[in-house]
Amino acid sequence: RCGEGVVIVDAFLYAGERECLDIRVHELAGVVGFHVALECDRTFTNQPRAVVGVDAPNVLHGVVSLGEGITDPWQREAVQRNTLLLGLETCADDDIILLGDADEIPSASAVREAAALAAEGRQVALEQLLCLYYVNNVEFTQRWRGTQAVRYDMLKRLTPQGVRDRRNLTPYAVKDGG
C-alpha cells in the first residue's frame, strides 16, 4: 500500500511500448499510488518474444510465461489480463484500480473523475480516442472504452477480463478519458 486512505493503482498489459509507458507515468504522477505493468513472453499470435522489462519509477513489472499451450490469442490475452491480480494483492478492497492496455493512456483529470464514481461501487469506462495502428490515425465516429476504473473488491469478483468484457455495458463513463 502507498500511504493511508484509498489508493489509485494503474494496472495494464505491457508489450514493450516504452514511449507509452513514459507518457503514462508522467501523466499520472501524483494521481496514482503505483503502476503494475504485466508483460508476456508470447506475442498475440503466439510467437516467442523477448521480455523488454521496465525501468521506470513507481512501476511494478511482472512477466507471465504462457508457453505454447494456449493457442487462441484472445484466451491468451484473457489469461494475461487476469494475471494482473497477482500484482494487486496488497490492495485494499476500497482501492481504485485502473485496468487497460499500455497504449490506452488516461488523462489525470479523467482518472480523478472516474475514481470518484468507482469509489461508489461502479464500473466506470474512460472514453478515449480510438487510434488505429498509429496515434495520428484517429477514428472520429466512435470513442474507445479502453481503460476501466473499479474498486478492487469488484475487480476480484468480476476478474480483470470480466471487467474488460463489460466495458461497453456500463452506463458510467468519463467522456474525455484521454
What are these regions (language model features)?
Residues 1-30:
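N-proximal low-complexity "stem/linker" segments adjacent to membrane-targeting elements
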Residues 8, 59-60, 123:
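Short, conserved active-site loop motifs that form the nucleotide-linked donor/cofactor pocket
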Residues 22-26, 85, 111-115:
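Short amphipathic alpha-helical segments and helix-helix/interface helices
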Residues 40-99, 108-109:
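Active-site-proximal specificity loops/subdomain of glycosyltransferases
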Residues 104-177:
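Conserved catalytic core of nucleotide-sugar-dependent glycosyltransferases
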